[in-house]
Amino acid sequence: MAIRNFNEETLTAEVLRRIEDTPDPRLKEVMTSLIKHLHSFVREVRPTPDEWMTGIKFLTDTGHWSDDKRQEFILMSDTLGVSMLVDFLNYQAKAGMTESTVQGPFHRPGAPEYPLGANVAKDPPDGEPCVVRGTIRNAKGKPIAGAALDIWETGVHGYDVQKGDAMDLRGIFRTDAEGKFWFRCVKPVSYPVPEDGPVGKMLTATGRHPMRPAHLHFMITAPGYDCLVTHIFVKGDKYLDSDAVFGVKQSLVVDFKKNAKGEWEASYDFVLKPSKQARKAA
């Protein structure tokens, strides 16, 4: 029976009734849960009209701050712990496989591809010289040749997109026949997530610091394997236990040491998870 005079008790049921004919079952499931939780949130918090409009403005501003070089919504998701929760639920690495973590808002498609051993840092480099090397294998220890490593990091003065520069401190490398990779970059440094937008204001308002521990981003792909999005973190960084985006996992913490040439050096081996299709075919 149609209802015109809704109240606090009847409104939610009517909103849910109106999406009953949603043809996509997954969309219906998601929207049903979203409506229930959103209405429950409003009942619990009981925002005033002004407070509700403040929330609407925050989301509107978050959209305005997002573009092809910066994703403020990802930053919001990261700093609220939602990105890591999605990661936990969807990428559960089995024993021996490399753990994933958040992608973050600063990945840029179309990074230049370099030969192994090349330097992703412009001259002069924005930081201390560093060499990173390792191997990519499957769970059985077999090297994966031709795997693509899309890497990116911040310099001492921020990410390239924050400085308005052309691509710097990012690039794509491919493993050799033995699954090995090596490249030059700068030693990762700790840095603040952007504080000039709505997410930065949210952190300030809630008494949180914006710092991320020093790390290097990796997005690793290879045919027959799930894409791995992860970091390696610098051992000893003071923000490892209070990462603003909750992204640290102990298995990803790496010791960076000086080599004989006075450069920083780190080594890390990645183990990829076979794709669902590959597991079915096995």
Q: Which residues does each PLM region occupy?
A:
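Beta-strand-dominated extracellular/periplasmic modules and repeats
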Residues: A2-A282
